[in-house]
Amino acid sequence: PTLRGKVCSFFSQGDGLAVAAALEDESYPIDELVYDLADLDASFRFCGEDNRWGGRLATACHKLYGNQTIPGYLENGVPPKYGFGAEQVVAGVHKNPLSKHAWVNELLGAGDIDRIIIEWRSTLRQISHAAELDWPRWTALQTIASEIVNETESPTITELPPLEYSQTKRVDHRLILRRH
């Protein structure tokens, strides 16, 4: 298999095609790509009035795949859930976690931001735990992804209270009917 094929095998659907396209573009800085990966799951929510298909990652995809549509993998040359704009939000929140609410507007809610951060961290985790390849750009992306995953906290981590005693007992879901 080619390096592109190996990278694609680490992901489901079209995300691997986009990552491979970005890595093959030698002029695409890895430190920008790591944030642009958030666009893979952004859909239309983050672009506002801008072009949903904009951005450096979409440009790399179009350069390599043209406007091909392959159901489930590419839609006009980019992954189907792609949407420009999430990279700015993710980079901003990564640099200053308290700035999350500054990004909230009539189209973009706090839940959307939490979701994209969760998806982005998941993609970075996938990259950091994937197999090593003899490709310096892939190795650099894995290194940066690992560093970011280890230094950031998931927005879903919550300290839960201890269980009540009644919650630790087995639940009996039988319905008992009485006859009169």
Identify the meaning behind each predicted range.
Residues 1-31:
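Accessory beta->alpha helical hairpin/"wing" motif in late/C-terminal subdomains of nucleic-acid enzymes
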Residues 20, 25-180:
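C-terminal accessory/interaction regions of large nucleic acid-associated machines
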